[in-house]
Amino acid sequence: DVVSFERLAYKVFEEVGEDNLEVLDDTGKNLIIKRVLEQNKDRLKYFGSNLSNTGFVSEMKSVISEMLQYDIKPDVMQDAAGAAYSDSEGSAALQYKLDDIVLVYNAFAEYIDKNYITKEEILDKLCSKVTESERIKNCEIVFDGFTGFTPVQYNLMTILLLMCPKIYVSLTIDASERENSVRGREELFFMSKDCVSKLYKICDEEHVKVLEPVYIAGKVVPGKNVIVNVNSRFKNSEELDFLEQNLFRNNSGRFNKKTDNIVIYEGAVAKEELTFAAGEIIRLTRLCGYRYNEIAIVTADMDGYGKLAANILKQNDIPYFLDYKRHVTDNPFIAAINGALGIIENNYSYDSILGFLRTGMSGMEREDIDLLDNYCVAVGIRGRGKWHEPWIRKFRGTVNNTDLEKLNSLRTMITDMLDPLEEVLKSKESNVADMVKALYEFLVREDMEQKVSVLNDSEYTGDEYAQLYKKVIEVLDKMYALLGSEKVGIKEFNKILASGFQEIKIGLIPQTNDCVVIGDIERTRLDNIKVMFFVGI
């Protein structure tokens, strides 16, 4: 089997009868962290004023996730906070930040205790159960594609070293390097060497025999056990092979031949870079026999280059796939949900009502929205009371009885839409489960799934909108399951829901196999690429 650490854990849990775990994902963590932040906001020394900042909950979630992943306990952070305080040159702000992180971490852990585990804790659980697995005891395990391991992963590997007949670890390192000699973080292969050093230390402490390292290289290296691989990936490109051998090396050489496989182009702006890339792609596919799926555009700045690259390729009729998961809080559907809740929270303020109507999800025609807008401004319609009583006032003789009849019809359309939701959200008897159910019924009543399914604009495709509706329902399901019995006000309910929406990301799969991939230099995995454009360097 080829599995990730997480998938290995689930296979072991299934074998040993530990497969009923409730695992908390990032959205669930966001929801709970937002709740505990609101509960403890008066106790926060530093972050109290940050609670309403966009992205703050996700940042706090990331900190807690890293603490879990690297097995950093709250008492370690508490000691660090104390050290910051006792240091004469220490920062009080740093101490307060660490104190706040510990407070939120402990509150989060207490909330999920005995009911859920986070995905970062899955390997901890695996460490306690893997020795019960008969299947693992007879396995030879190969760890491939890693540059290093987290402390929890090293703990698991320690257990596996004592259980399994053989374990292989493949790492990237030059055959001329000393694999167990770590001089500094600035070394080219520091991460691989550091990993080897830690594994050697574990083997030494556990009295595990280490076999002679095997290198796969393009040539024999004296004193090393080398398997010579003559089928180098750069066998047809002398300059790329030279670049690999000399890039970031202390004693790098100079390539004095003509370079056919490396081209440097400088554009004044991003659009110029990408226009050049598009022209080259057209030339390569039409004149040189390349397929689109053999070409990729890679950048470290997907926000600045991804969408622009997609637009330029589209203009040139070049099929592409944008490998990019993005946040979706800036679309009409999310805006409509926030708008409807905002109307109730803000007592039918002018801005909240018009903001909701302008999303295009209310079912009201644009001309009717303009008519409402003009009347509300001219007559001064403000507050829930005004919206729940008949409008009879005319202004400047421009509104006749027919217009008033139309306006009142539009008024009742809005109040009838929101009243059932408002009744539940403002009831002192309602808990989060009741509020989530009322919001879901609002979405169903207003046929939001159908409205979302026909959306397709310059920002999002129809397929992305289809994903979005399902993701929103998943957030509601998680709120219902994780926070259902909690009692909160409408303001806090809206904040918790917004924190869940912040974690929603959508992405697509390629519509065709033959397309240019536009991807991130860290995230995107590329296979069988023959031409690569690095942009935004």
What are these regions (language model features)?
Residues 1-537:
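Polyanion-engaging groove/track-forming segments
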